[in-house]
Amino acid sequence: FTAALMAFASSMVLANFVGMEYETVAETANGTTYRVYATFDNPTDELVAVYALETAPMVVGVSTSFYQDPVGAVLAQTINPAFFGAFPTLQYDSWFTIGSSDSNGTSDVQQVGMDTYFAAFEAGGGFMIDTFIGGSWFLLPNQSPDAEAGADGRVLIGQFTTDGVV
């Protein structure tokens, strides 16, 4: 998992960016659910983009597959936690974000150049972005308190559930 974090870290917009960390949040029949965070040294630091291109590639890899719930989504902002009661496995869906863990958050993440990569991810696979054009998910600066590092110095960038090795 560390190698994937370091590859991810090379694709982060830097603003007192310290590194990456993850935590295990659940163990289910669908696998282990991890949350991945970008870490910063100042509580007011803001993450506004995660990007990759030829000179700063990103690898999101897995030895088996990522769990993708049938009613889930590629971006956390489109997951409504009100549906967790009816679809309990939805809370373990794999997704990307900048700060928000569901539709109750403040992040309005946009993307450019990610359609092919997100499609592979939604099919359960990983991807590598290493092209001249690249890809990014991002939000407008100063629009989302969830994108600020806060007291713990962390900004959530994704949740990944797998029965394999990330």
Give names to the regions the model predicted.
Residues 1-3:
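Bacterial N-terminal signal peptides that target proteins for export
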Residues 6-15:
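Sec/Tat signal peptide C-region and signal peptidase I cleavage site
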Residues 16-166:
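Non-catalytic macromolecular-recognition regions in eukaryotic signaling proteins
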